[in-house]
Amino acid sequence: MTINDGGAALCPGNPGGGYAIPCVTDWNGDGKKDLLVGYQLAGKIALYLNLGTDAQPCFTNHTNLKTGNGSDIYHPSSGCGAPAPWVCDFDGDGKRDLLVGAGSDGTVWFYRNTNTDAAPILAPGVQLKVGANILTVGIRSTPCITDWDEDGLNDLLCGAGDGYVSFFKNTNTAQSPIYAPAVKIQAGGVDLNLGIRSVVRVFDWDGNGLKDLVCSSDTGVYWCRNTNSNSNPVLQAPQTICAPVSGSGLVPIVTGARMRVYPVDWNNDGVMDLVLGNAYGTVYYYEGYHFRISHVTPKTGNKVALQWDSAPFLNYSVLTNDCPINIQYPAATNLPSGGNTTTWTNQIQGDQQFFRVQIAQ
């Protein structure tokens, strides 16, 4: 997957301030993507209902998310934090709930949906705990619920203001999670630290069947590739995700300070895109796209230079298998724009062939 140059603004100028933290979800159960955005200085969560289609979302006005008693969900934050929304069925009752990471103290709050997916009504927030103690990552928590160890129970991954990512294992049930003490996620054999203000999402970025981490921080957007298994992920060191810019090659994605990432297939074309919030309250959309190889040039040393229609100035080199000198117009899919290695699939041959490729600098 390659990310389009530049990015398009989805909802510039969030109400009341900046530090936008986006979450894409079908909030009202109408089959279309909606957008939740945590924002400062108000410390609230804006709900943008989709007035377009699922493949072509359109947003105009917003409302602030409220609990069932009519009060706005509110999480004040000192400095440059904002409430970080995450939507999932947290208690296993088949309905979407809301989790919110608090900027000021690094806690995570659970707002239970007491009504339906078509018309969510949220109970007052309850802080998550580790044993009898309040769960916290210190400051600027950004929760992500996922079954990290594939034991059938949803765990919690959480970014933090210090740039580390913590794994809280669910040791109880899907209906009543109980979390073990935090364990730092490792990448490249050391504790993963993305700089400051880390956000982490789980997605199979390179299409090899293994879940990876797609992350962001103040310094960029990153991919941590899983080289082991889904039940026991072993992550490579973070690699910067870039976008092709004509005349400049691959350039790291930057939307401004305080980048917060959310991967989603925004336009329903089967390729993952990136939605990014920043410090100025703007939410950007970077489109991932399939592309078709336009030219294959065999080179010495079991390598081949590939050129494609959307970015002919980029070269990739085959690192394994024989040089595919007889391929004409192969289709490449799910090729990440960042990182040293990935896979691409030749769909023209009778049998699919897979090659490990590397950006030729």
Residue ranges: model-predicted function:
Residues 1-17, 51-80, 114-138, 171-195, ...:
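Blade-edge motifs of beta-propeller repeat domains
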Residues 20-27, 83-90, 141-148, 198-205, ...:
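Beta-propeller blade termini
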Residues 29-39, 92-102, 150-159, 207-216, ...:
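Acidic/hydrophobic-patterned starts of short beta strands in beta-sheet-rich repeat architectures
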Residues 201-202, 209-211, 215-225, 230:
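Loop/turn-rich, solvent-exposed surfaces of beta-rich toroidal or solenoidal domains
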